Amino acid sequence: MATDHSGTATAKALIRLAGPAAWARRIAQFAQIAAAGPHVRRAVVQRHGLELSLDRIAKGAVRVPSAAERRVLDLARETVSVYATLPPAGRERLRALLHACLADDGTLIPLFHLMRTAALQRDRGFSVAFTGLAEGTPFDLLLERDGVQAEVACDVVSAEDGRGVHRGAWVRLMDRVDPDLQTWLANHPGRYLLKLTLPQGLRRDAADQDLLAALHDRIRTMLSAQRRADHDEAAVLRLDPLMLAGAQAGELGLLNSLRQEFGHEAHLAVTECGGGVFVMAARAGRENEVAVAIRRRMAAVAPARLSGTRPGILAMFIEDTDRAEWRHLRERLELEGEARQFLTFPEARSVVAVTCTSRLELFGATAPDGVPEGELRFRNPSHPSAKAVALAPAVLSSV
């Protein structure tokens, strides 16, 4: 068989598992969603980069895959290989998982997180069985090394669950507001900064669509009336001149400067028209609690997914985060603190270790953006198997 240097055959094989018609519909859905505006379009490309990359590769649009694309292809190849080893019921479960990944707001992350977790443990000397797929066990993987077994439950948690202002809602607001800002700049040349504080938050669910429309109307009314401030219990808005040094004039320099001023939690957007610049910076009324949301998810997953008859490992994938936030969670020890707190809870009785990873590690990012060894690990010192030598490569704390 010819070597698949471009990855085309691998990508096509995964698409055949999904069903070519279902895959084509999914790619078409991305185009429909992206038509909402440029901010939503960028968000779609970022969130669904796995699917879009595989689609381009399958169509022969990528002659030489990048390092990140090669990692994606490795996971696609692993998926196809695992499918071939499964019994009929297991193959149906894998197809069902793949179809769920391609439905609604889903991505391939749950499937690829499972495959990547298995590959990491094999590289550490464990034999790995896909019992969740093959047998329908609540946990996903059964590890064994030197006669000692451990269960692994893989789960994906969105950083949005810990944010007061969802990025998904923010990009939709920006696409609503951007034409108004263009008009404003055309009639009022200059540099402006609109700061928004949203005490009640802004989420992407249907319940907040009315709030999104109301906030858009308030911004438009504020600009048309040339007011500098507006506030109520839902939002505090303030319009100020934007002060720029020479080095900050470009969009990249401006965003870096604003990020330093407002912090990693701020939602930022820049609109330009002619020589005018309009910046919007939004924050919730309280600090984000991403690490807290992860801890709550772990407390829900552990008793539901681990049998309690063997040492259990929770393999958590942190989705919808970025470089700045991921580094903040690690460097400020927020993630470590919440993980270690969880390990003291009754729900963690069967958990010997927790691992955490993100897209940065999946795509091969190195320190300081990515985590060495591909994941953070936190061992539960109170678990009876915490010091088991056979389990050490999978459970020893990485920090």
Which residues does each PLM region occupy?
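Charged, structured surface patches that assemble and position nucleic-acid processing machinery
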Residues: 1-124, 132, 156-399
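Secondary-structure boundary elements
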Residues: 120-127, 145-148
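A short glycine-rich beta-strand->turn/loop micro-motif centered on a GG-aromatic cluster
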Residues: 129-136
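Short acidic loop-to-beta-strand element that houses the catalytic metal-binding Asp/Glu
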Residues: 136-153
